[in-house]
A protein has these predicted regions:
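Core segments of transmembrane alpha-helices
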Residues: 28-33, 153-163
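Cytosol/matrix-facing amphipathic helices and coiled-coil assembly/linker segments
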Residues: 1-20, 72-154
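The feature identifies polytopic integral membrane transport proteins across all domains of life
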Residues: 13-24, 46-54, 114, 146-151, ...
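Juxtamembrane boundary at the C-terminal end of a transmembrane helix
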Residues: 222-232
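Interfacial loop-to-transmembrane junctions
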Residues: 190-215
Length: 232
């Protein structure tokens, strides 16, 4: 039973990372493919299309990394501030903190006597850990790493973004838009199904949802490209 529980905990962590990776790759695919399609629809030559796509890849990856770094850093700062405050309160008012932990367990369904016993034993073993986990909701096993999160976010975005760029290099010059659109939609369907499967949702529904928005984004940028291409 303990082996199953241990496996389930690690599976939850892996699913979280998988979903984040899929979302990053989706962002890279949709944004870069849409940019490539829009520039190609404007009648630009292959070198111009590739330069625009590569610039979009770099800008998007850096933006994702910066956003993830700021987000995770802010979360980490908030958690550390909460833990520091809890440490001070445990030092200054230990009885009040024990009462607070007891009320927390009573609210979860334990009777007051048992809740007091649990709170007392956990406090004797690791008071800060008990309060961090059960009062603040900060799991002991989950630690946010801003730099790691930023690198993963940038890398997954770049992996998705490089797909339409490769197709733009290999496709016939006159059919770059078509080849990029078809390849991107197929890749989005696969990623959408993978993300849905990781989250326990229906694979077909997840694939169609992502594919629809990808198609809409590329259609919108193609329309803009054609409009400005005609005007020019």
């Amino acid at each position: 039973m303990s082996r199953l529980s241990h496996s389930e905990v690690h599976m939850v962590h892996r699913i979280g990372w998988l979903r984040a990776a899929v979302l990053g790759a989706n962002d890279g695919l949709v944004s870069t493919a849409s940019l490539v399609v829009g520039v190609a629809a404007a009648g630009s030559a292959r070198p111009e299309i590739l330069i625009a796509g590569l610039a979009g890849l770099v800008a998007g990856a850096m933006s994702m990394a910066a956003g993830e770094y700021v987000s995770v850093s802010s979360q980490t700062d908030a958690e550390q501030a909460d833990i520091a405050r809890e440490t001070r309160e445990l030092r200054e008012t230990p009885e009040a903190e024990l009462d607070e932990l007891t009320r927390n367990y009573v609210a979860r369904g334990l009777d007051e006597s048992l809740a007091r016993q649990v709170a007392t034993q956990l406090t004797e073993k690791d008071a800060l850990g008990a309060h961090s986990r059960d009062e603040l909701g900060i799991p002991e096993t989950v630690t946010a790493h801003p730099i790691q999160a930023a690198l993963v976010s940038a890398a997954t975005f770049a992996v998705g973004a490089v797909v339409p760029l490769i197709i733009a290099v290999l496709a016939p010059a006159a059919q770059i838009t078509l080849f990029v659109a078809i390849t991107t939609l197929a890749a989005l369907a696969v990623l959408g199904g993978l993300g849905a499967s990781a989250g326990g949702a229906g694979i077909f529904k997840g694939a169609m949802r992502v594919t629809f928005w990808g198609a809409l984004a590329m259609a919108a940028t193609a329309g803009v490209g054609m409009l400005f291409g005609v005007v020019a």
